[in-house]
Amino acid sequence: MKFLFVVDPIKNINPLKDSSAALMQASSKKKIEVWICTPQDLEARGDEVWASSWRAEVCPWVSFKENKCIPLAEFNCIWMRKDPPVNEGYLYATHLLEVAERKGVKVINKPSSLRAWNEKLGALRYSHLMAPTIVASKVKDLINFAQINHDVVVKPLGGKGGQGVIRLTKDSPGIKAMIELITSQEQLPVMMQKFIPEVKEGDKRIIIVNGEPIGSINRIPQGGDFRSNLAMGGKAEKTNLTAKEKKICTELSQHFKDEGLFFVGIDVINEMLSEINVTSPTGLREIETLSNKSVSDKVIEKLLEII
């Protein structure tokens, strides 16, 4: 059995922190051949897509064994694990992967759903589970929302890991200029949400695999920052799901399965949905460290049940 992981350049992956590394190692333990490429290594020849890929040994970490150009149809599963931004290169890669999908290859996550589910906008499908939210580019609309809700968080729609996220109040000096800047002079929409003060107690990342929540961590902001993202210095703590959080997972899970979203990370603050991460969800390493359980092994086992 062969798995292909479409990832960022391997030198950018920290094997001690990265969920892609955890999934590669779990695959290898199951005697699955692990092959690695970047989106730039994909090419179409007629109706066949190929990958200039490297076969890798990944225990404890990557050592490359051979480089071959292989038709994607030869792989049992392809993991699209390229980190955001979801730019033109990313989108084109999903179209190429879709060719392989039509030939019967399992692609995680489904390419068309990767295109359809912006990680900020996707959550709007479940707005009743969220804090008050607006997505807009007009300064007057965003300022009006801030005045109504007093304390807000502004998120660029294409960001990741807390990058570019700012907090404003209705009385923030220069609020108009700041919104003009983040919307590129009203050319780009942004998400603005009512600030949830309980974020100081944590922002939960919940990993959902084939519709089942299999692990979670609570991320605590550090050093006076309101952002709890691990990439921004947030501290991971062990956690359990509340009854309401389990209900949120249940409501979302069947939709994820229907959309071919096998591996998803959702973020929940004070029992309210914040974001839905489908491109390259993280958190496996931290969950495993805190729970002393190999969650990555369970991910691969659940995948093998459906391919």
From Swiss-Prot:
Gene Ontology cellular-component terms listed: cytoplasm
Binding-site list for Mg(2+): 275, 277
Catalytic activity: gamma-L-glutamyl-L-cysteine + glycine + ATP = glutathione + ADP + phosphate + H(+)
UniProt-listed InterPro entries: ATP-grasp, ATP_grasp_subdomain_1, Glut_synth_pro, GSHS_ATP-bd, GSHS_N, PreATP-grasp_dom_sf
Cofactor list: Mg(2+); Mn(2+)
Short name of any one Pfam family annotated for the protein: GSH-S_N
Co-factor binding details: Binds 1 Mg(2+) or Mn(2+) ion per subunit.
Binding residues annotated for ATP, in chain numbering: 146-202
Keyword Manganese tagged: yes
EC number(s) on file: 6.3.2.3
Pathway: Sulfur metabolism; glutathione biosynthesis; glutathione from L-cysteine and L-glutamate: step 2/2
GO molecular function terms attached to this record: ATP binding; glutathione synthase activity; metal ion binding
Keyword terms: ATP-binding, Glutathione biosynthesis, Ligase, Magnesium, Manganese, Metal-binding, Nucleotide-binding
Every ATP-grasp domain range: 120-304
Alphabetized NCBIfam families for the sequence: glut_syn, PRK05246.1
Family named by the database record: Belongs to the prokaryotic GSH synthase family.
Protein name: Glutathione synthetase
Natural source organism: Prochlorococcus marinus subsp. pastoris (strain CCMP1986 / NIES-2087 / MED4)
Gene this protein is translated from: gshB
